[in-house]
Every structure is written in structure tokens, then in C-alpha cells.
């Protein structure tokens, strides 16, 4: 009995329309596209949509900086985004924008239903206001000193140094990031979505088993801490949709952004004419709805979004498919290192299938971060796609074309081996279906090893030179081509461009349901190179080009030029270092050393012995006695030839005679902690 085809709607998170697509974005779109292409190969009806997230203060301000209207900026950005996604063969059925008539109508409809059902609450709040720009300031547009660790230049919602969260009003000496003016407090009436009213429904959804375990666990933490009402409005000036019957009030971008999924699908329905919007979004819809998103936006998609849909009488998502972040060479993407690589820059240098394959080989259904190691990227693509898969075709096609007029043999040389390959279809399909593409790739490459071992053992290049063995040569090479066909069928969701060239070469479409029937007596076309090896030089050029995309850095002079600032550490790392004020009671030369001084330090109740390499700077050690300095007090004792050193004194300078012992300000006492 044939399986009934599913009807599936798939979305990716909407890219924000104030910047270019980069390789971090591409992880999600590639993951979703692989899953969508597989579902289509299996006969399911899939509608794959996305849109630009085109509203909010950042877009309004960036357009002002560019001297253009926001509408022009988001239109240009949409064109760039769509070009990048097309370059990576992301098979969207529709790519739209949240700044659309469909989205305006649906946002108003959902808001109206929520309000009518009693889920919208009004209350007056106090906010920071920029008196020069005449606008209320979002959290990220206020900067000041962290109220917890006192780090300067921190955003209005959290500190990037100590990790603390707070409200913008708690900042010390806050400034508007827009004008630099000191903001003032003003009151404004805002509208709130009553999220706590949906707590029971959301907890039941969480426990349903549909969500990834990591997502469900995170949601439970939020439930335990208590859900809060959600502010869904912003005051003018704001680029977005005005709230019906509330002049000067606009929907917060995160209210209309997920509704953009619905707007993009509504736009597709209107274009096509054969799709029913309610079949996919109606309260009792039997179709499937999946959102591919990053772990940074789980909060909005797992709490606000299903609650909004429930409260406005629409269906909830079938599931959220959440992925981790992308690092490059083991670190956060960096513009200075050239590893913040835009999608458009990548496409100038490399085949999109290469990145699609590398991501696929690393992806699983878990919310794990993916590292794009550029050297491993080159090696893996060349080893797997070129050496294992494409090489299988090139090793056999030449003989088929030259000796047998491009026609494959009428029988399989090894039906048992061929069945081993086709039997793997079930487990590989399960892996793809469960978003375990890394597992699928491992199984496919294991088969590729078997196929190449078969060719190595049969040695067609030797058989070709032996008289009377044409039939053997024909059978061996035809078997090799058929194994290549099975492998490429399995790889079709991952490698669309290579698949297209392969289908032209094999003169047949690669379909999942046809692999059990080998190509027998079938004509193939002349073999042409199907895939080029990645040249590491090209990768290095891409990285260099990504560096050049930045504005020229100001030339550093002085001490920083000779001794650059080290890699950033976390506040927790810094907090492990215990620095104390110390009184130098005694300072003396160390016999047998022309670099060290022996210091006896008093820490207010405890005495330490420290050996310090400052002799060249302080030829008269007695001059140091009675002086206050700073020492690292919790450094592990170090056994030296002259004795045990029980800490380290702090000094500045390049070394030699240019060393300057640090001293605290007057009033500091021995033993005081340096913070």
C-alpha cells in the first residue's frame, strides 16, 4: 500500500533586513533545504517559504544614516538576500517581506482577535527618551556603565563583561546611542500581551514530546521563573505597522515578524490560486508546520508565537527545529580575522555545494554549535566528494564511452553488492527525515568506500589491456556507474548542483523510488568533469577578501603596536585572579642571578616571598623597601633554584631596565583586594 503524501509547510527564521547574509545564517537555510529536498524526493507536498524581517528601530536609523527611505533600503536588501539564497540553491517557493499588505492585514487580524478575547492589557510605563531625537530608546540604543561590575560602554539590557541583566534605567550615566544625549524618563501607555494566561497550554505543549529535549528543558526553566506579560507596542517614530485605532503606537517588530510566516504563505496562495491558506493555518489544520530556527530565538518561537496563535484561533506549529551557532576555526566569526564571511563573498570563490556538504556532514538533530574549520573543510570536501564519489564515475565512464559507445551492460556484475547499496535506503532515509544528516553522510561515505574498493579489486584498467575480456570490462565499469548512481541519489538533497550535472551525465533523473532498478542497457553521455577540487589558495583569498570588506583599521602606534592586547577573556576568568595590595618589607639581590630580586611582602597578617625579574630596573633594591605594590596572591607557588616564589608582583613595560613596578593610590592598605 502506497504511503499517503504529507502536506508540509516549512519556514526558516526571517533574516533581518539591515545587513548581508553570512555563513552563520546559511547553516539554517542549508539544513532546512536539505530536509525539504528529501521530503520532496519522498513524494511529500512541501511548501518552503521565507521573508525578510523588515521593521524596527535599527532599520529606521540605518536608513536615516544612508539618507534613504526605509522602504528603499529593505527592497535593496531583499534583492541581495534572495540572490544569495539562490546562489546556494535554497529551494524557496516564495520569499516575501514582513513589510507587506498581507502581513499588515494578518497582524491587525491577530491583534484584533487577541484584544477581543481579553489578552491585550494596557498600562503606563516609564522609559528612557532621547530629547534631541524626540524618540523613546530601545534597550540596545542606550549605553552606560554596568550597575553590577561598573564596566563602561554597556548596552541597556545586559552587560557583555559580567553577563548581568538589568533594565536601561539601572545603567550608570546612561547615554543615547543615537545622539549621545543624556536620556530623560518619560511615561507612555503601552499594550501588553497576557502571556501568563497561556501557561497551562504552553506547558502541555512542552510535555507533548514534540519538541527537542533541550528546548523543552529550557522552556521549563522559563516556566519555573514565571511568565511575564509582553510589551507589544512601540511609540512613534518607528518603522512598522501602526496599531489599529491607536495613533502613534506601532506593533513591536517581534509581534509582526513571526506573522510574516503567514504573510509569506498568504502571498504564495494568492500567486498560485491552488493553495488553501486555512488548510495550513486554520485552527484544526491537519497539515504539518515546521519552523527551522536558531537557539537564540527559541524564547519568541516557543512561548510568544504559539500563545499568539492559540489566542487568535490559529493552529500552532507541529514542531520547532532548533540549531546551534556557527564558529569558524574554533572561534566566533571575526571581521578582523576575515572569518566573518558573507554569503555573496563565498560564492565568488567557491561552489555552494561544498559548504552544503560540509554543514550536512556535521549537522544533527541536537542544538549543537557547528565549527567551520577551513582546513578541514578543504580536506573533507576533496576527500569525500572528489576522491570518493565523483572519482567513482570518472574511473569507469571513460571505458564505457570509448569501448562501448556510452552504453551500459545488460546485466549487473554483482547483484548482491548492488542490493547492499539499495538496502541502505531505509536507514539513510530515516537519518534525513530525523534531521540527522551527519549520520546519513557517514553511511553514504561508508558505501562509497565499498564501491571504490570494488573497482580497485576488479582493476578495470588492467582488464582493459587483456584480450578477450571486453565483457568483463563492460560489466565491471557498468557496475561502478550504477553504484555511483545510487550514491548520488542519496546525496541529491545535499548536492543539488552536482546532482544536476550527474543527471545530465547519466541521462536519467535520480529518484529515491527508482534505485532498486539498476541502469541496464542504458546510454550515458560523454563524461565531463563533474566537480572541481577546492584549492586552499581560493579559501585564503576568500578570507583575505572578507578582511578587505572592512573599513581600514586605524594604525596602532606606541606600546600596543609592539605588544597587542590579548584575546578577550570572560569576567569569570578574570575573577579567578586575586590581586592584593602588598608592602615591600625587604628587597635584596639574589646570589647567582643577574635578573632577580628577592622581595619579602607583607599582606596585612601574612608574609610572602616573591622572586621578581626586575633587577635591571631597580639596581638599588633597598629603594623599594617601604613601598606599596600590587601582587597576584593566588598564583600557585613556584619552586625555583633560589627558593619558592609565592606570587607575582605587577609591573608594566617591555622588560630590561624599562620595567615599572605598579603602586596603588594613597590610602590603600596591605591585604586590600584589587578589583
Curated annotation (Swiss-Prot):
Localization annotation: Cytoplasm
Residue positions binding ATP: 335
Binding note for cofactor: Binds 1 zinc ion per subunit.
Chain sites annotated for binding Zn(2+): 146, 149, 159, 162
Residue span of motif 'KMSKS' region: 332-336
Cofactors that this protein relies on: Zn(2+)
Key words of the record: Aminoacyl-tRNA synthetase, ATP-binding, Cytoplasm, Ligase, Metal-binding, Nucleotide-binding, Protein biosynthesis, RNA-binding, tRNA-binding, Zinc
UniProt cross-references to Gene3D superfamilies, sorted A to Z: HUPs (3.40.50.620), Isoleucyl-tRNA Synthetase, Domain 1 (1.10.730.10), Methionyl-tRNA synthetase, Zn-domain (2.20.28.20), Nucleic acid-binding proteins (2.40.50.140)
Domain tRNA-binding per the UniProt entry, residue ranges: 573-675
A biological process term (GO) from this entry: methionyl-tRNA aminoacylation
One Pfam family in the UniProt entry: Anticodon_3
Keyword Cytoplasm: yes
Principal subcellular localization: cytoplasm
GO MF terms, alphabetically ordered: ATP binding; metal ion binding; methionine-tRNA ligase activity; tRNA binding
E.C. designation(s): 6.1.1.10
Catalytic activity: tRNA(Met) + L-methionine + ATP = L-methionyl-tRNA(Met) + AMP + diphosphate
RNA-binding as UniProt keyword: yes
Assembly description: Homodimer.
Stored NCBIfam families: metG, metG_C_term, PRK00133.1
Function: Is required not only for elongation of protein synthesis but also for the initiation of all mRNA translation through initiator tRNA(fMet) aminoacylation.
Family affiliation: Belongs to the class-I aminoacyl-tRNA synthetase family. MetG type 1 subfamily.
Protein name: Methionine--tRNA ligase
Gene: metG
Amino acid at each position: 500500500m502506497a504511503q499517503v503524501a504529507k502536506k508540509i509547510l516549512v519556514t526558516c527564521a526571517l533574516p533581518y533586513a539591515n545587513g548581508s547574509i553570512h555563513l552563520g545564517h546559511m547553516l539554517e537555510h542549508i539544513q532546512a533545504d536539505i530536509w525539504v529536498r528529501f521530503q520532496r524526493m519522498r513524494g511529500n507536498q512541501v511548501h518552503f517559504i521565507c521573508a525578510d524581517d523588515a521593521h524596527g528601530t535599527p532599520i529606521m536609523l540605518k536608513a536615516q544614516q544612508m539618507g534613504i527611505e526605509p522602504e528603499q533600503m529593505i527592497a535593496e536588501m531583499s534583492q541581495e538576500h534572495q540572490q544569495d539564497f539562490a546562489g546556494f540553491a535554497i529551494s524557496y517557493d516564495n520569499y516575501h517581506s514582513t513589510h507587506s499588505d498581507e502581513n499588515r492585514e494578518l497582524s491587525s487580524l491577530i491583534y484584533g482577535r487577541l484584544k477581543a478575547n481579553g489578552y491585550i492589557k494596557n498600562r503606563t510605563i516609564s522609559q528612557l527618551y532621547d530629547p534631541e531625537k524626540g524618540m523613546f530608546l530601545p534597550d540596545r540604543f542606550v549605553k552606560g556603565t554596568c550597575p553590577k561590575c561598573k564596566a563602561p560602554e554597556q548596552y541597556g539590557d545586559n552587560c557583555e563583561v559580567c553577563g548581568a541583566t538589568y533594565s536601561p534605567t539601572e545603567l550608570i550615566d546612561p547615554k543615547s546611542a543615537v545622539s549621545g544625549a543624556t536620556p530623560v524618563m518619560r511615561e507612555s501607555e503601552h499594550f501588553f500581551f497576557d502571556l501568563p494566561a497561556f501557561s497551562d497550554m504552553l506547558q502541555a505543549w512542552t510535555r507533548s514530546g514534540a519538541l527537542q529535549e533541550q528546548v523543552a528543558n529550557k522552556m521549563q526553566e522559563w516556566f519555573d521563573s514565571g511568565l511575564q506579560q509582553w510589551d507589544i507596542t512601540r511609540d512613534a517614530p518607528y518603522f512598522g505597522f501602526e496599531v489599529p485605532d491607536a495613533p502613534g503606537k506601532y506593533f513591536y517588530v517581534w509581534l509582526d515578524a513571526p506573522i510574516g510566516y503567514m504573510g509569506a504563505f498568504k502571498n504564495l496562495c494568492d500567486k498560485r490560486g491552488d493553495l488553501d491558506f486555512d488548510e495550513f493555518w486554520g485552527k484544526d489544520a491537519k497539515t504539518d508546520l515546521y519552523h527551522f530556527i536558531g537557539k537564540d530565538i527559541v524564547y519568541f518561537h516557543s512561548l510568544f508565537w504559539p500563545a499568539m496563535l492559540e489566542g487568535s484561533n490559529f493552529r500552532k506549529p507541529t514542531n520547532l527545529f532548533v540549531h546551534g551557532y556557527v564558529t569558524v576555526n574554533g572561534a566566533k566569526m571575526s571581521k578582523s580575522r576575515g572569518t566573518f564571511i558573507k554569503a555573496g563573498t563565498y560564492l565568488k570563490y567557491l561552489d555552494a555545494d561544498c559548504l552544503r556538504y560540509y554543514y550536512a556532514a556535521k549537522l544533527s538533530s541536537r542544538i549543537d554549535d557547528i565549527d567551520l574549520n577551513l582546513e578541514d573543510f578543504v580536506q573533507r570536501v576533496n576527500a569525500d566528494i572528489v576522491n570518493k564519489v565523483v572519482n567513482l564515475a570518472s574511473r569507469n565512464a571513460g571505458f564505457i564511452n570509448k569501448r562501448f559507445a556510452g552504453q551500459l551492460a545488460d546485466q549487473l556484475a554483482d547483484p548482491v553488492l548492488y542490493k547492499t547499496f539499495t538496502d541502505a535506503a531505509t536507514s539513510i532515509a530515516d537519518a534525513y527525515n530525523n534531521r540527522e544528516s551527519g549520520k546519513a553522510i557517514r553511511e553514504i561515505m561508508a558505501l562509497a568506500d565499498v564501491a571504490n574498493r570494488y573497482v580497485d579489486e576488479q582493476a578495470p584498467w588492467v582488464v582493459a589491456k587483456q584480450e578477450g575480456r571486453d565483457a568483463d570490462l563492460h560489466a565491471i565499469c557498468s557496475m561502478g556507474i550504477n553504484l555511483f548512481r545510487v550514491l548520488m541519489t542519496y546525496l541529491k538533497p545535499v548536492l543539488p548542483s552536482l546532482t544536476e550535472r550527474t543527471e545530465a551525465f547519466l541521462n536519467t533523473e535520480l529518484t529515491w523510488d527508482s534505485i532498486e532498478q539498476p541502469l541496464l542497457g542504458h546510454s550515458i553521455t560523454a563524461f565531463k568533469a563533474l566537480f572541481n577540487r577546492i584549492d586552499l589558495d581560493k579559501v585564503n583569498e576568500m578570507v583575505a577578501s572578507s578582511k578587505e570588506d572592512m573599513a581600514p583599521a586605524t594604525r596602532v602606534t606606541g606600546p600596543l603596536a609592539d605588544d597587542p592586547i590579548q584575546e578577550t577573556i570572560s569576567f569569570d576568568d578574570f575573577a579567578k585572579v586575586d590581586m592584593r595590595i602588598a608592602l615591600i618589607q625587604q628587597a635584596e639581590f639574589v646570589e647567582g642571578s643577574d635578573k632577580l630580586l628577592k622581595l619579602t611582602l607583607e599582606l596585612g597578617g601574612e608574609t610572602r616571598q616573591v622572586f621578581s625579574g626586575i633587577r635591571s630596573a631597580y639596581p638599588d633594591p633597598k629603594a623599594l623597601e617601604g613601598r606599596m605594590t600590587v601582587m597576584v596572591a593566588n598564583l600557585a607557588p613556584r619552586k625555583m633554584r633560589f627558593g619558592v616564589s609565592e606570587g607575582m608582583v605587577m609591573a608594566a613595560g617591555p622588560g630590561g631596565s624599562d620595567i615599572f613596578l605598579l603602586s596603588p593610590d594613597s590610602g590603600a592598605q596591605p591585604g586590600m583586594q584589587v578589583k
